Amino acid sequence: MQYKTAEFFSSIHTSILENALSGSHLIKNIEAKLIISIVDTLIRYYLEIPEGLTFDDVLIIPTRSHIISRSQTDLRTRLSRNIFLNIPLISANMDTITESGMAIALAREGGIGIIHRFMTIADQVDEVLRVKRSESVMIEQPYTISRKMNVAAAVQMMTDREVSGLLVEDEDNKLVGIITRRDITFESNSEKKVSESMSKDVITARQGITIEEAKEILHKHRIEKLPVVDTKYHIVGLITSKDIIKMEQYPYASKDKKGRLLVGAAVGVKGDFLERTETLLDAGADVIVVDIAHGHSDNAINAVKMIKKAFPSCELIAGNVATGDGSKDLIQAGVDAVKVGVGSGSICITRVITGSGVPQITAVIDSAKVTRDYNIPMISDGGIRTSGDATKALAAGASSVMVGSLFGGTDESPGKTIVKNGKKFKMYRGMASFYASLGRKYREESSQLIESDDLNDYVPEGVEAMVNYKGSVVDIIRQVVGGIRSGLSYCGAKTVIEMQKNAKFIKITSAGYTESLPHDVDVV
């Protein structure tokens, strides 16, 4: 838009100059010089300062569609070079948005959650394991307990691991029984041995059993847990009726090759990031996200190179950047996907504090020119308030969108519910906010005294806020997905890639935006 405007002013410039030189009586030379000076200034302005657009500045022009029903659309998309999602939604790696609860809920719907890094390595690994163990074709390395332990230990382990039963093994790691909460409910003697309370006649299956065969055994014997053992009766895995039911209940869930839910985890660019990456990958994290506010920096680029060198097969996402040049540098460093967005989040004040950033639609379009050439997926991160925003980001070139505030305040987001003036709220904060940074500093320097000067020197680029309690995130996910599907149908597209080929944007005025909202009525 800015270049067409400049060309227009340039044509006026030429016309005025020709008239002045030819002695036209339409205008006097002195008037021509004044107008030329003004036009020159406008040309310089439009050539040197490009225009930046965000979601509210544009609409997608509807086109002819052969889509009969939005159910015909397919939202399958690439998260990274080799990982696919069934819906293009990612929950943000923020400490008030994504831990295991959010990651499980989103993966079951077809997306993925990125576990935030603002915790110890052990705690972050535990969150990843919770997602991986939440459901699978067969639970590998199921939780076990020695038959010599007491009932109190069994209860504690079930509580800590959030499971309803444990496999019991002997000194040779052979299966000898199974103990469930049902076996020890109302047990008055907590010192009683597990071997005395467990069920000893355990129905088992051999390695290689199919799901259909497992369903038959579970039904025939009216049991809920089916241990899988080898020829020497060593425990290989565990198949549960709950997992099979979940497979049928969530047919579009995002899963790995072992049938476990997909989950990602964030790391930084300093300190323990290599150790953290290795431990998270060992725990089963499907993708690692290098998490830094200014991704177009030597710190981020060097971290990407180091991670890729140490773990070549790791699926690696990095960001955040706001330009095509930033995306190109990260891709050349070795990333498998680029995360785009600087200052677009609802609790981010980077643009206000630093004066830096690019409006999100422009940032996505500029980055898409590069990521498309390299065939690398791009994630639009920040500013998603509605399904329409998500649709625009995808149409502009993103393969998926990362969501923060929209998922905040839900049952699955971390943190306690706050009641204020009779209304329910949950905390939501930017990871560059003062208290988030203070908490991070305490964790990183727990053995050292934090000087007040260190805190005074810190300039927050995020804020803390309360958001209305919203209930389950599943309802929000399905509303957003439904809106995106409708957006595809308005573009005459069955897939996200088709929409990107078909989509044409139109810039709107503030009046056009107002017209897009409910108006001249009292909304009930």
Regions found by a protein language model. Give the residues of each.
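Surface-exposed amphipathic alpha-helices with a cationic face
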Residues: 107, 129-132, 155-159, 176, ...
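Alpha/beta catalytic cores of nucleotide-metabolism and tRNA/nucleoside-modifying enzymes
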Residues: 4, 40-64, 71, 146, ...
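Active-site-adjacent beta->alpha loops and helix N-cap segments on the catalytic face
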Residues: 121-127, 241-252, 274, 293-311, ...
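Glycine/Thr-rich beta-alpha phosphate-binding loop at enzyme active sites
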Residues: 59-73, 119, 265-267, 287-296, ...
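Bateman/CBS regulatory modules and CBS-like beta-alpha motifs in cytosolic regions of diverse proteins
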Residues: 69-86, 92-94, 123-160, 168-170, ...
